[in-house]
């Protein structure tokens, strides 16, 4: 078509084009691979957005290779949006995440929220993984990375008109057993992240978000400090200098409730003559992480008027 007048209105049909709105799994992987190098790209929270199990597995691989980032993932839209039965939604969510491998570098949530899109002036369903990552970032801001981002203190999801899937208590318990952190709306309290598990299936300290992010924080900080020991002599002076750097840092983390106790071993017991001859430097750091409360038991006991509490307590 040749345009000869700048003011004339023309109706032109386009053919053989591609709107390019739906990125393939391979294209998404190419984009997220920009985060692969932990030395040049500093990122701690990776949001999966809307994607299938293969996409989430690809992101877990990126996070596990980096060892300093956590992936946040939601189920597929079709699992919860437009599904009228809540039990079917729960079954869909559990089934979807059962197909994703175990890892402490991923966090699963239970679905989608309905919110206003001010850029398009419409209401739409969006996956909750962006919100959960936002809660983790806000926890860093108002507390520390080793605090849980869940609960009524730090786990309120903003801007949610409603949830596509609002699980009941029984459904939340089943989701939690399946490594899925439920997001639920409570009357008068708001929409809340009601779990802090990672995607690790085996019982471990690292099956909690706060513990995984605690170790990421510790490992990044201490690894940065250890670089100053490179090309120094592996003698008692260097080892004492390293301990004097690490121990005050761990005491500060302990004072800020991240760990309950720690031990740093960096002496001749683990830096033997063989280690020194290999031009290596070894430090062993033992920590006891603080654990978040997941279950609360309240017992109310009625006593007679004349009974002393000293007699019945305990």
PLM regions: where:
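Structured, hydrophobic secondary-structure cores that serve as assembly/anchoring elements
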Residues: 2-314
């Amino acid at each position: 078509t040749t345009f000869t007048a700048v003011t004339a209105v023309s109706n032109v049909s386009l053919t053989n084009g591609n709107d390019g709105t739906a990125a393939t799994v391979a294209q998404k992987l190419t984009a997220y691979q920009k985060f692969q190098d932990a030395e040049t790209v500093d990122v701690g929270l990776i949001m999966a957005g809307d994607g299938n199990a293969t996409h989430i597995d690809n992101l877990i691989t990126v996070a596990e290779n980096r060892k300093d980032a956590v992936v946040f993932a939601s189920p597929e839209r079709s699992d919860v949006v437009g599904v009228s039965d809540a039990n079917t939604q729960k079954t869909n969510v559990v089934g979807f995440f059962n197909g994703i491998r175990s890892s402490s570098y991923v966090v699963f949530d239970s679905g989608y929220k309905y919110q206003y899109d001010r850029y398009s002036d419409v209401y739409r369903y969006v996956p909750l993984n962006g919100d959960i990552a936002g809660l983790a970032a806000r926890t860093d801001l108002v507390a520390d990375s080793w605090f849980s981002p869940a609960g009524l203190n730090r786990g309120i999801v903003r801007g949610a008109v409603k949830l596509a899937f609002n699980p009941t208590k029984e459904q939340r318990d089943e989701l939690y057993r399946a490594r899925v952190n439920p997001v639920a709306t409570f009357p008068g309290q708001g929409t809340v992240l009601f779990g802090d598990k990672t995607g690790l299936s085996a019982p471990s300290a690292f099956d909690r978000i706060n513990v995984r992010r605690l170790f990421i924080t510790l490992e990044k900080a201490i690894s940065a400090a250890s670089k100053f020991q490179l090309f120094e002599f592996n003698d008692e002076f260097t080892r004492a200098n390293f301990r004097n750097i690490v121990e005050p840092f761990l005491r500060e983390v302990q004072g800020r409730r991240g760990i309950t106790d720690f031990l740093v071993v960096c002496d001749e017991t683990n830096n033997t003559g063989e280690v020194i001859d290999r031009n290596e430097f070894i430090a062993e750091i033992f920590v006891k992480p603080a654990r978040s409360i997941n279950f609360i038991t309240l017992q109310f006991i009625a006593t007679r008027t004349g009974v002393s509490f000293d007699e019945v307590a305990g």
